[in-house]
Amino acid sequence: MSTHTETPVDGSAETITGAQPYEAGFTESSAGRVYTVTGGDWEQVLGVGEDDGERITVNMGPQHPSTHGVLRLVLEIEGETVTETRLVIGYLHTGIEKSCEYRTWTQAVTFLTRADYLSPLYNEAAYCLSVEKLLGITGEVPERATVIRVLVMELQRIASHLVWLATGGMELGATTGMIFGFREREKILDLLETITGLRMNHAYIRPGGLAQDIPDEVIPEIRAFLDYMPKRIREYHALLTGQPIWKARMVDVNFLDAAACLALGTTGPVLRAAGLPWDLRKTMPYCGYETYEFDVPTALEGDSYARYLVRIEEMGESLKIIEQCLDRLRPGPVMVADKKIAWPSQLAIGSDGMGNSLEYIRKIMGTSMEALIHHFKLVTEGFRVPAGQVYTQIESPRGELGYHVVSDGGTRPFRVHVRDPSFVNLQAVPALTEGGQVADVIVGVASVDPVLGGVDR
């Protein structure tokens, strides 16, 4: 009958009969001993752990609810301290970039809008701006189309930050913040559905302009939202900004200064929370952003709490831009005049809301054979883009979203590469989490706000 020794709290030893032996190779350390977390024996526990150099490797994800998707974190921990963080990605790879090579320039939009599924309009905008540069029609895009692009992008910036607020609040136990965030996001999704026909994956921004004009009836709804949302932002401040538990979990946690951000290539709120006012809408304007009045919120602390404050303030600045967009809306076309590119500019909105105008269908089917042939070839074959390559970057809710688009002169993209900000910003997670507590890993990932659809593509 095998025995082993258990050391009670009072330090005396007694022999326990009937105990099963441990696996071969175990050392006489803390195995089989009973300890308390207070008292004289706790120092002995710490000493044993240090002498043996024991580390535990744990997996956080890819099914963990706090990883914002199918992200796997391999953590090496000593006690409650994270000594090493390794990221494993690729679980959500769908081959979006490669699929674009087998579709026309316009059809590729329907793939790319599914990359970062929380801000699909930004993928559409960055891609279409790239194609327009290759076509040499950047200056020909109608002003109304450009204003509407800015309008819908800023609406989606607020919606994306609201998801970050809701999911981050849920992960830290602030369930009221989760309810508030999704409540306001639902109102924005209703507006985007009225404008584009879909709540997400819109395929609304097209090379040369937009798929369709903005409905007149949505303008009063947007203005009502502009009156409603500032009150809700003040509500978030009242609920969370000064909340002791919220601050205790975020202040001086997951610190990353400006130098580290630049070394790692991080952009967006993570970089601005470290004190650098880098916003492509200001530094490298596109879509006429240089004509809009808004500020770039920054903070100096570089911790998770600073990133929270930056995103909250950005929602207020987006409201300013949206209001200016509504004031600038003037009647006019929303697609370039070149009929060799402007698909589907002639497909006005029909009763089904999906662009099947019976009036235009009757025209091309019954009165103009040439129009029918042109429409058929434009839809099935697509337009040709001159050979060349271009890189376009815009400021998405998560940072710099870049598109490198290459054309060989054909009707399909030769190569489309996405520089997704979530992919780059995730490289900062080890720097944010190593040396901290296990519980702070969740805060660190949430403060980066990654979307795995854009990371894996």
Curated annotation (Swiss-Prot):
Main location: membrane
Record Pfam families: Complex1_49kDa
GO CC, alphabetical: plasma membrane
Reactions performed catalytically: a quinone + NADH + 5 H(+)(in) = a quinol + NAD(+) + 4 H(+)(out)
Keywords: Cell membrane, Membrane, NAD, Quinone, Translocase, Transport
Classification via InterPro entries: NADH_Q_OxRdtase_suD, NDH1_su_D/H, NiFe-Hase_large
Its membrane topology: Peripheral membrane protein
Residues covered by region (Disordered): 1-23
Superkingdom assignment: Bacteria
GO MF assignments: NAD binding; NADH:ubiquinone reductase (non-electrogenic) activity; quinone binding
Subcellular localization: Cell membrane
Enzyme class: translocase
EC number annotated for this UniProt entry: 7.1.1.-
PANTHER family: NADH DEHYDROGENASE [UBIQUINONE] IRON-SULFUR PROTEIN 2, MITOCHONDRIAL (PTHR11993:SF10), NADH-UBIQUINONE OXIDOREDUCTASE 49 KDA SUBUNIT (PTHR11993)
Family statement drawn from the similarity comment of this UniProt entry: Belongs to the complex I 49 kDa subunit family.
Subunit note: NDH-1 is composed of 14 different subunits. Subunits NuoB, C, D, E, F, and G constitute the peripheral sector of the complex.
Physiological role: NDH-1 shuttles electrons from NADH, via FMN and iron-sulfur (Fe-S) centers, to quinones in the respiratory chain. The immediate electron acceptor for the enzyme in this species is believed to be a menaquinone. Couples the redox reaction to proton translocation (for every two electrons transferred, four hydrogen ions are translocated across the cytoplasmic membrane), and thus conserves the redox energy in a proton gradient.
Name of the protein this chain belongs to: NADH-quinone oxidoreductase subunit D
Originating organism: Parafrankia sp. (strain EAN1pec)
Lineage of the organism: Bacteria, Bacillati, Actinomycetota, Actinomycetes, Frankiales
Gene that specifies this protein: nuoD
